[in-house]
Each structure stands twice: as structure tokens, then as C-alpha cells.
Amino acid sequence: MVMEKLGDSLQGALKKLIGAGRIDERTVNEVVKDIQRALLQADVNVKLVMGMSQRIKERAMKEAPPAGMNPREHVIRIVYQELMEIIGKGAEIQLKPQIIMMVGLQGSGKTTSTAKLARYFQRKGLKAGVVAADTFRPGAYHQLKTLCEKLNVAFYGEENNPDAVEITRNGLKALEKYDVKIVDTAGRHALEADLIEEMEQINAVAKPDHKFMVLDAGIGQQASQQAHAFNDSVGITGVIITKLDGTAKGGGALSAVSETKAPIAFIGVGETPEDFEKFEADRFISRLLGMGDLKSLMEKAEETLSEEDVNVEALMQGRFTLKDMYKQLEAMNKMGPLKQIMSMLPLGMGGMGGVKLSDEMFQATSDKMKNYKTIMDSMTEEEMTDPKLIGGSRIKRISRGSGCSPEEVRELLKYHKTMQTALKGFRGGKFNIQKMMKKRLGM
């Protein structure tokens, strides 16, 4: 999950509201104190935290809840709105021809983000190419070239040319027919005079439509100083925050974004190209507060899965065979780690009724899903289509063929029956818990 520790702490604070007998000044102060602690531990700037805390207190005690909203929901809504105020709305990413310049510190994940960004635009139907203008770091050329080849992205570089400005000029000319051209510049300390001069020269030659600064989520309080230096040099138009997975604090990077007023454009939440997301502030805050992000989950499914992966029409008609379940397990595997998928579900769905699953439990569940596939690999086409045929003798045969126990085969059949019943229950209904929650809170 994105910033898991901060999310857990914020959700814990809001649970005090839900469990409180009445919402008075004492309750609000307790909740605000917990929110303060959570944000400060995540490296959010002290000034930002104190200002937000004061506004939450004042609004919670002075503002009357809108019609149809109880005091608890009103305070949660205020917290949501104030977090949105700190983070901002996010950058507007237009799908049109453009030049993008990438800047950032060495080790921030800038080169990897460059390739992933090109891949993002390609998935949206635009031709994207990358220029390797980082001549400072040994291995930068080969790293970017390898990434681009892996992602099937056009690449331009001059391995033995030390002149980054000349490479940029030549690269943009070579990629002239491409819609999106992304220039990867050298990553060093933002206050180094030679880096600033080189960035300014590349900026003058490339005339980029966007200048994205890449920040490591774990950079801490020094993020603000670095962000200001880059912004003063070339004028940052957007921020990409990398390594924003479960272990990252991330508050320093978020503070830098707030102070420079440069909107967040993308976030990196893992190693694969699929773990690179366009930033949507409302969805990000929803995930932090345990409201889930069903819209992102659906978009991820649409981007990753083909019509062959899941027979939606058959599912909605209540037809769910073992073949369908096998495809479903393969589809989930394509979408990424189970923990990441579950983090997009509202608390109570992904969190098993509000109880968060441990890493060990997620791993055990993933292992069980792999086990189920192994068992189904030992079934006949007839059995996969009609599970009712599987009796005692067939269970023994499947058990021997898969190397699993008869009990595990029976467990699989029971799981299939449970899924089949659940899908029949959803048929014809509109199930959108996140939409209901947000509508209830007026968000």
C-alpha cells in the first residue's frame, strides 16, 4: 500500500471518531493530536502540520455539518479536505505532442521513471522516445537503453559523447517524428553550480513543455531545499515521487510539493512499469484514509487485462466454472501483488471487515492461489467446465497429479462454490461502496 504506516495511523485516528459517544472539543483535540503525530512521523513539515491541525480544530468546532451529515462524518470530511489542501490537485497530464525534461538527485529513480513515463504515454496511444542526456553517472546510458528495450520504447543516446547539451539537440532531432520526447538529465546535488548550469543549457535547447522533478519518497526534510533549488533553476512544472511503497515515509516529498506549489504528476509505487501511476489527489487521500480507490483498480484492470482474461458477460449471468476461476487467478497475477490490489479496496473489503492483513497473511494467500492453479492444471477439460463431476475417485487422481492433498482439492472446490454464490449475489446490482462513502461524506 502507498505510505502504509501513515495510512494506518490516520485510519487509527479516525476510528476514534467512529467509536466516540459524542463529538466534543476533547474528542476533536485527541483526534487532531493523533493526526499530528502521524504526519510528523512521516516527515511532513512541522509548519504545515501545525497549520493544518489548527484549521481542523477551528472548522470542526465552528462549522455546522451540512444537511444529511452527522458530526462524525463532518470531521472526517474536514480532515479529507485539509489533506487535499496540503497535497494539491495534481498535475494535468495532456495526451498531446510534448517535450519533457527530467531533473532530480542521483539515486532518486529518475532514469527508471524516464522509461516508465515513456511507457505510460505509449499505452495512451502516443509515440514516445527517450534521450539519454545523463553523461555524468557511469552506467546511466546502458541502464536507460536496457530499460527502453525492455519496455519497447524508442531510445537515443551517444555513449562516448560527454556533451549533454549536444546530445539533447541531436536526440530531439532524431526523434522529431515522435509525439512525446523525454530528456533524462544528470542527477547530482541540486546546489552544485555545474549541474545548475548544464540544466539551464539543456532547458534552453530543449524548450520543454514540462519539467518534472523526481523525488525519492524517503528523502525526508531536505526535500524542500532541493526542490526550491531545482525550481529556481529551471522552473519545475510537475513532480514525480518515487519509491512511495509501504515502507516509505513520504512526508518530506509531499511537503516539498506543497511549498514549491509544483503539482504531483506521477507516483512510483514499485519496481514494475505497472507500478507507475498518474497522480490523482482525491484517490490518494481516499487510500490513506481507508476509503479505497476502486476507480484506479478498474483502470488498472482495463489496462492490464484483455477480454480473453475474464468473461464478464458469463460472470454477470452467474456462469462461473473452474476455467473462469483459473483465468481470474491469472488475471489477478497480471495486475500486480495481491497486497497492492487489496489496498485499493475500501476498508472492510480489502481489510477483511476493518482488520488489516499482515504481510505473512498476504503471502500465505498468494501461495494458496498458486496452489489452486497447480491443482486445476491436473484436471481434465470436462472437470474444469463442470466441477460437479468431481467426486471421491477424481479427487484422489487430481491429488496425485498435482502433488497436493485431497483436503486441498476439496478446499479449492469449496472456494469455487463460494465465489460462484457471491457472483450470483452481485448479478444485476450496482456495487460501489466507495462511491456511497464519498457521497455520504460530501466529497
From Swiss-Prot:
Residue sites binding GTP per the record: 104-111, 184-188, 242-245
SUPFAM superfamilies: Domain of the SRP/SRP receptor G-proteins, P-loop containing nucleoside triphosphate hydrolases, Signal peptide-binding domain
Subcellular location: Cytoplasm
Broadest EC class assigned to this enzyme: hydrolase
GO CC annotations, alphabetized: signal recognition particle
Alphabetized Pfam families for the sequence: SRP54 (PF00448), SRP54_N (PF02881), SRP_SPB (PF02978)
UniProtKB keywords: Cytoplasm, GTP-binding, Hydrolase, Nucleotide-binding, Ribonucleoprotein, RNA-binding, Signal recognition particle
EC number, UniProt record: 3.6.5.4
InterPro entries: AAA+_ATPase (IPR003593), P-loop_NTPase (IPR027417), Signal_recog_part_SRP54_M_sf (IPR036891), Signal_recog_particl_SRP54_hlx (IPR013822), Signal_recog_particle_SRP54_M (IPR004125), SRP/SRP_N (IPR036225), SRP54 (IPR022941), SRP54_GTPase_dom (IPR000897)
PROSITE patterns the UniProt entry points to: SRP54
Reaction catalysed by this enzyme: GTP + H2O = GDP + phosphate + H(+)
Domain notes from UniProt: Composed of three domains: the N-terminal N domain, which is responsible for interactions with the ribosome, the central G domain, which binds GTP, and the C-terminal M domain, which binds the RNA and the signal sequence of the RNC.
HAMAP family reported in the protein's UniProt record: SRP54 (MF_00306)
Family stated for the protein in its record: Belongs to the GTP-binding SRP family. SRP54 subfamily.
Function: Involved in targeting and insertion of nascent membrane proteins into the cytoplasmic membrane. Binds to the hydrophobic signal sequence of the ribosome-nascent chain (RNC) as it emerges from the ribosomes. The SRP-RNC complex is then targeted to the cytoplasmic membrane where it interacts with the SRP receptor FtsY.
Record text on subunit structure and interactions: Part of the signal recognition particle protein translocation system, which is composed of SRP and FtsY. Archaeal SRP consists of a 7S RNA molecule of 300 nucleotides and two protein subunits: SRP54 and SRP19.
Record protein name field: Signal recognition particle 54 kDa protein
Organism encoding this protein: Methanosarcina barkeri (strain Fusaro / DSM 804)
